[in-house]
Amino acid sequence: MLEIDNQTPLESDFLLLEKIADVLASTQIIELVLVSDETMREINRDLRDCDYATDVLSFPLEAIPHTPLGSVVINAPLAQENALKLGHSLEDEIALLFIHGVLHLLGYDHEKDKGEQRQKEGELIKAFDLPLSLIERTQEC
């Protein structure tokens, strides 16, 4: 189940994200928080000691029954900027960031694993007919 806290002017029905959440964690609650660039910078600075806005952060919660899996926080203005720059829709960009964030909630870590997160992202991207994944875009730079 997906709970959405949209703190931005972005309007969407978020149906694609609900489908993705159902595939990845059908029995758990995932919180999606859409924030401004400045709010994301504050979160990143306060919680990770990184004084810049990033596109997506994930915050897993303890594995306690009947509690949310965790929160995925997405920087909506940066997602819009990247969607325009990369030539795909904002909905697709947010879906890519959401997949990336939820996989972190599920324990995947592309900085430490041996390609498992990249492989899982690839499977989901194909299943939902999405453009290039966040990990693959980052590796191309």
Swiss-Prot record:
Gene3D superfamilies associated with the record: Metalloproteases ('zincins'), catalytic domain
Gene label: ybeY
Entry EC no(s): 3.1.-.-
Location(s) in or outside the cell: Cytoplasm
Entry-linked Pfam families: YbeY
Keyword hit for Chloroplast: no
PANTHER family for this protein: ENDORIBONUCLEASE YBEY, CHLOROPLASTIC
Cofactor binding: number and manner: Binds 1 zinc ion.
Source organism (scientific name): Helicobacter pylori (strain J99 / ATCC 700824)
Major localization listed first in the record, in broad terms: cytoplasm
Protein name per Swiss-Prot or TrEMBL: Endoribonuclease YbeY
Domain of life: Bacteria
Cofactor: Zn(2+)
Enzyme class: hydrolase
Keyword hit for Membrane: no
